[in-house]
Amino acid sequence: MALFTEENIFIVTGASSGIGKTVALKLVEEGAKVVSIARNLERLQSVKAECVKPECFLCENADLTEHLSDMSGYLKSLKEKYGKFSGIAYCAGQILLKPASATEYEESVNLFNINYFAPVMMIKTFMDKRICTGGGASAVAVASAEAFLREKGLCIYSGTKAALQASLATIAKEVAPRGMRVNTVSPSDIKTPMTMNEDMISIRQGREETYPLGFGEPGDVSELVVFLLSNKSKWLTGHDYIADCATF
């Protein structure tokens, strides 16, 4: 039996690739409608073509950092277009691989904007009953195990993910009395376009052999994200769930 119906409308960011793509496709497979957001519209439309029910995969082309100062206005415009939302999965993100000594302020701010401020502003705004369905609404953000693994060269990236975990756990406590839930999922190494590019070779070298089950696939994470968005996890909120294979 499907987890959702077409009355359940979800927002998924970063839906054109990686974990966001598999989350969006899985939600549609489980019966929901998905407003899929990404900066690359061409890639997003190609994902729609893969969908089992393309009519339930709704494409929105946006750079979320451009809406930081008025996230409320942006989400209200989506609600007016599609209706109230049952949940949101924030899967958009970027990585910055540099030693701390070479890291510049501006690039650090840019990374915090997409990895921290955008999800925090989006999720705290989403929890407005004028935008979400109220009690039972669920938000999940993809963080990272790097928040506590603290690999060399990932100073700012690790900081964005640790901050995200902490802030969303706080928001979860604030919205729990209204029956709303907020969680994060922190994967270790997953084979996505972001983590498997040439810039990440120095991190990956010799690392996969330390993974008892090898590097994960995006689908290994999306199953957990979809579970946390569903009513099957109705008692779970305010926590970070590690997606890993006994690596640490």
Across the structure, where does each feature detected by a protein language model lie?
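Conserved glycine-rich cofactor-binding loop
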Residues: 16-17
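Substrate-binding pocket helix/loop in short-chain dehydrogenase/reductase
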Residues: 99-100, 107-112, 207
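Active-site helix of classical SDR
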Residues: 123, 160
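Alpha-helical segment proximal to the catalytic Tyr-Lys
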Residues: 128, 173-177, 234
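Residue(s) in the substrate-gating loop at a strand-loop-helix junction
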Residues: 144
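Catalytic Tyr-x(3-8)-Lys segment
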Residues: 201-220
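C-terminal substrate-recognition "lid" of short-chain dehydrogenase/reductases
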Residues: 215-243
